[in-house]
Amino acid sequence: MSERKYFGTDGIRGKVGDTPITPEFVLKLGWAAGKVLARHGSRKIIIGKDTRISGYMLESALEAGLAAAGLSASFTGPMPTPAVAYLTRTFRAEAGIVISASHNPFYDNGIKFFSIDGAKLPDDVEEAIEAEMEKPLTCVESSELGKASRIIDAAGRYIEFCKGTFPSELSLKGLKIVVDCANGATYHIAPSVLRELGATVIAIGVEPDGMNINEKCGATDVRQLQERVLQEKAHVGLAFDGDGDRVMMVDHLGNKVDGDQILYIIAREGLRQGQLRGGAVGTLMSNMGLELALKQLGIPFARAKVGDRYVLEKLQELGWRIGAENSGHVILLDKTTTGDGIVAGLQVLTAIVRNSMSLHDLCSGMKLLPQILVNVRFAGEHNPLESEEVRKITEQVEVELAGRGRVLLRKSGTEPLIRVMVEGEDEQQVTALAHRIADAVKSAG
């Protein structure tokens, strides 16, 4: 694979107003994508977005570029990323485009593409789009220009799809659920799904103003959800990120339940129901406690590189069906083609109802080892991970852990961050060791 100039691990992302997230660049991107995608036959593209204020500007730019290449755009309005993947499949569109920066602050935005089957675009198609970007923009004949339309019932279609992943013989009646939609794309979807399945729903993070997406709420900050679950004496809480492809949960005692624990619950339930094909895929960041708990159940476990696209690749390579990142991306290939927070949450709720067990009890078979993650921001072109001092300190830490823990350093694929993760048996030791490495990374950056 050649080095890509614009596409990262999750599409194209950046600060609004800075290249590449400018109207000029996105218009050219729409045109280049249109030129490449038009070669495959269909001339319809689905465009969805989250609730960021910049989404209006960027969808207009995308639509203009696509139209110039002869492709028509169908807009969904604010819609979760997995909903756009689903609608792309059901409308047999040539591609789906999501305008979102996922869990990032409102002043960031991004563009990611789905192929006709609802999966991420293959690398060679992304590379072809980048190659087209280098050419001068030309417009098709006036009679061949693309048009724009709006999908009126997009939300209703996706709500019905989500409900269809919950067993028809079960109901959420009797469950009180707090749901935090991060003032993002699930704000008008998730509460309706849960209510229509019978739950009593308290919804927070459902008042987007274009600038409050992910702000002290949602899957990246569950403190507000934890407080509300305890205050309302709710059975469970669910938190989604800004574009709805991640989910975190909170049990009735206010404890956070992360992607590793969610994967454990879904894998165990699949085993109990005789529906588990193969094993489960996690990532290099997945807690060792997940691996040990699955081993006890006889469920094979494999680690992929960090990033939901790599989890998906590993699932396809092994022929398995379920995988997750501890950040809450959960991929269930029997139901979806990409990470879907609402669908993943519904599978955990299925286990709660079917087994008449609390979320807390469902997690009890898995003991999380202390895992400390420190994010170190760096400036400039130099990668701190190439520093001799960082390498030396990391080796010292590994010696101190003496085979009873793990160290992982990696560069973020979406932000100028080095993620330092240390895992072991003793939380105090793990914390000190993580910060020792982080200090070395800071000095090197």
From Swiss-Prot:
Entry's Gene Ontology BP terms: carbohydrate metabolic process; peptidoglycan biosynthetic process; UDP-N-acetylglucosamine biosynthetic process
Pfam families with a match to the protein in the record: PGM_PMM_I, PGM_PMM_II, PGM_PMM_III, PGM_PMM_IV
Protein name: Phosphoglucosamine mutase
Family: Belongs to the phosphohexose mutase family.
Cofactor binding mode and count: Binds 1 Mg(2+) ion per subunit.
NCBIfam families, per the entry: glmM, PRK10887.1
Record field: catalytic activity: alpha-D-glucosamine 1-phosphate = D-glucosamine 6-phosphate
EC number: 5.4.2.10
InterPro entries: A-D-PHexomutase_a/b/a-I (IPR005844), A-D-PHexomutase_a/b/a-I/II/III (IPR016055), A-D-PHexomutase_a/b/a-II (IPR005845), A-D-PHexomutase_a/b/a-III (IPR005846), A-D-PHexomutase_C (IPR005843), A-D-PHexomutase_C_sf (IPR036900), A-D-PHexomutase_CS (IPR016066), Alpha-D-phosphohexomutase_SF (IPR005841)
Active-site residues (renumbered): S102
Keywords of this entry: Isomerase, Magnesium, Metal-binding, Phosphoprotein
Gene Ontology MF annotations: magnesium ion binding; phosphoglucosamine mutase activity; phosphomannomutase activity
Annotated Mg(2+) binding sites: S102, D241, D243, D245
Function: Catalyzes the conversion of glucosamine-6-phosphate to glucosamine-1-phosphate.
Post-translational modification: Activated by phosphorylation.
Keyword Mitochondrion: no
CDD domains referenced in this protein's UniProt entry, alphabetically: GlmM (cd05802)
UniProt modified residues of type Phosphoserine: S102
Recorded name of the encoding gene: glmM
GO cellular component terms given for this protein: cytosol
